[in-house]
Amino acid sequence: MGAIERNGYIFEPEYSVISQDGAIHVYKEGKFVEEIKFEFQGKFPEHNQIEELVNHYCAQFHQ
């Protein structure tokens, strides 16, 4: 799963299958902004879950 670019931000997801959690690191202009934590089930998070988190971030905090 690669980085997602949206609204001037870069979202880089990473996750741990063992602990069943992950985080999306948010960057703007190359600088770290914040971390969005999430949980998932299965072997990896579904792409739709990541997209929903990114969409929510963009809609709620940085229009």
What are these model-predicted stretches?
Residues 1-31, 35-39:
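N-terminal acidic leader/helix
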